[in-house]
Amino acid sequence: MIVDFLSRDVGEENFGALIESYIIHNALRDKVLQMKNISLFCPNFYEEINFVEDGVEVFLNNKNILKSKLLLACDGRFSRLRDKFQIHTTTKNYEQIAIVFNIKHQKPHENIAWEKFLPGGPLAILPLKNQHHSSIVWIAPKLDSQAIIELDQENFMHQLHKKTENCVGEIEIISEKFSYPLIMVAAKKFYHEKMLLVGDAACGVHPIAGQGLNLGLESIKILQELIKQYFLSGLEINSQILIENYNKKAQKSARKMVIATDVLNSLFESQSLAIGLARDLGLGLVNRLPKLKKFFIKNAGGF
């Protein structure tokens, strides 16, 4: 069964953009270097962090001491800052591995992203800027993943062609393959003293819906709006009320995404005939009911 989501269904020219991470990193770094009110301390690292009455002090290995109203922990799903201050987490190991690489292909992708839900796990074909280049995210059971990665080129390509079902024609791999385990990690609270968890440090979800970066950006948006609101009202941007408001709003946003991605993965991973029939019925309804389809598009795309 094929379910298609089109941007015109919600009156938009497109859903958004698929951008390789190194491009985003380089653009952000260039922007930071242009900002006169931002100082970059890299590759320095912290040796000690103290919370004081009016904020936080960070002692760096180069003997600099940074003082701030707030400290943002943006150090990823396996955050050392989160662990340092003993913020407990809920975790779920999906016993799956994501294998990621770029391909060159015969047919133009026409800016269409495909996600194929197949026995053993989904495979996503994500269009890049070049019409004949795409990124592959191949999700496989942990038990099978090493055998897949270690396949010789001929057998790996044979398996890949079977999974893509010729939707982009002949394929050539044009990058290194890398893999990572799929583990959901959600902090039980998104703060400690004057430190806030942001992005994957707060919550990292299953990539099945491609919403990990968007969830991180949403936490930044929530914090930015709260800081602006409190600053314009003449209130301290590190007040306990702001911190608790951020925790409440960001956790609510993250909780919805954790549930959605977890349920979606379970539905397509299940071998149960009853669940399979219910899943196919649900997908059929999405295709036949425009309002239901719009609901999914708007929630995924942030429209």
Locations of regions flagged by a protein language model:
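C-terminal helical "tail/cap" subdomain of flavin- and related membrane-associated enzymes
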Residues: E225-F303
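Short glycine/proline- and charge-enriched loop/turn segments
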Residues: D4-G11, I139-P141, T261-L264
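A general structural signal for well-ordered alpha-helical segments in protein cores
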Residues: S21-H25, R29, Q96, V100, ...
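Conserved FAD-binding catalytic core of PHBH/FMO-like flavoproteins
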Residues: N64, L70-E170, S175-K177
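Short, solvent-exposed loop/helix junctions and linker helices
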Residues: A17-Y22, E150, L217, S272
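FAD/FMN-dependent oxidoreductases across multiple families
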Residues: Q146-F231, I237-Q240
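Structural motif
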Residues: V52, P119, L128, Y191-H192
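Conserved N-terminal helical subregion
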Residues: M1-K84, K92-I97
